[in-house]
C-alpha cells in the first residue's frame, strides 16, 4: 500500500477486534488516520516538558518477503529518528533479530529490544534454526533465553518476551528468571499484558517495564502497589 492508501483507513472508528477492544472503555475518534513516524514526533514536540519515550517496532517477517529489504527499512526509520534528534528517547524492537543487528550497524547508539514469541524461538529442526533469531539455534545454543541472548549480545540491549516465557511456573518458561536475565545485563520488558493480576505477578518478578494495550489499568496497578511513574 502507498501512504495515500494507508491514510484512507479510519483507525479512530473501525474496530478490528470488538472482543479485545470493547466500547466502552475504548473511545471512538472518527476520522483519525494512521500517523507516519514523523507525525508522531511532531505530536510529541507539542509536549516538550513530558518525559516520553518511544518504543518503535519494525515489523518484518522472515517467512514472507513482502516488505522492503531490512537495511533499507531500518535506514528509513533511523533517518527520521536522527532528524528529530531523538536517538536518546527511543528504542527499536523487532521479532526479527536481523533487524536489531542492522540497527546496531547503522546506529549503534540507538537501543534495541529483542521481541520473542511463544513460537518464534523454536528451531525448524536439529540443524536449521528459527528464521526469526538471525541464525541462532535455540536448542543447540543451550535451550534457554539467556543462552540465545548471549549469542546476540552485540546487538541486543533489552529483552521483550511473551510474559509466559519468564514465569517459572509456566509450561512455556525458558529457563531463566527475570533476576537472572537482569543480572546478565538484559533489562526485561514483557508483552502483551492486559490483565491486572498478570501485571501484578510480573511486577513482583522484577520486570523493568510492561507492554500493554491498557496503560490505564497498568497505572491503577502501579498505584495500588505503590510504584511511582518514571
Walk through the language-model features, giving the residues of each.
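Metal-dependent phosphodiesterase/phospholipase catalytic core, i.e.
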Residues: 1-120, 132-136, 140-148, 154-156, ...
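C-terminal active-site rim and adjoining tail of enzyme catalytic domains
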Residues: 115-116, 122-230
Amino acid at each position: 500500500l502507498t501512504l495515500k492508501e494507508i491514510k484512507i483507513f479510519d483507525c479512530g472508528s473501525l474496530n478490528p477486534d470488538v472482543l479485545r477492544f470493547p466500547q466502552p472503555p475504548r473511545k471512538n475518534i472518527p476520522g483519525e488516520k494512521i500517523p507516519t513516524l514523523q507525525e508522531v514526533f511532531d505530536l510529541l514536540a507539542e509536549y516538550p516538558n513530558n518525559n516520553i519515550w518511544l518504543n518503535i517496532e519494525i515489523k518484518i517477517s522472515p517467512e514472507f518477503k513482502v516488505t522492503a529489504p531490512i537495511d533499507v527499512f531500518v535506514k528509513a526509520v533511523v533517518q527520521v529518528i536522527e532528524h528529530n534528534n531523538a536517538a536518546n528517547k527511543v528504542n527499536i524492537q523487532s521479532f526479527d533479530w536481523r533487524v536489531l543487528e542492522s540497527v546496531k550497524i547503522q546506529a549503534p547508539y540507538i537501543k534495541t529490544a529483542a521481541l520473542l514469541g511463544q513460537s518464534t524461538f523454536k528451531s525448524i529442526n536439529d540443524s536449521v534454526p528459527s528464521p526469526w533469531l538471525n541464525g541462532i539455534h535455540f536448542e543447540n545454543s543451550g535451550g534457554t533465553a539467556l543462552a540465545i541472548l548471549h549469542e546476540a549480545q552485540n546487538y541486543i540491549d533489552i529483552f521483550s518476551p511473551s510474559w509466559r516465557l519468564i514465569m517459572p511456573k509456566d509450561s512455556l518458561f525458558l529457563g531463566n528468571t527475570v533476576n537472572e536475565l537482569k543480572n546478565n545485563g538484559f533489562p526485561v520488558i514483557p508483552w502483551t499484558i492486559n490483565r491486572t493480576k498478570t501485571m501484578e505477578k510480573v511486577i513482583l518478578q522484577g520486570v523493568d517495564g510492561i507492554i500493554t494495550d491498557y496503560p490505564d489499568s497498568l497505572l491503577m496497578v502501579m498505584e495500588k502497589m505503590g510504584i511511582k511513574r518514571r
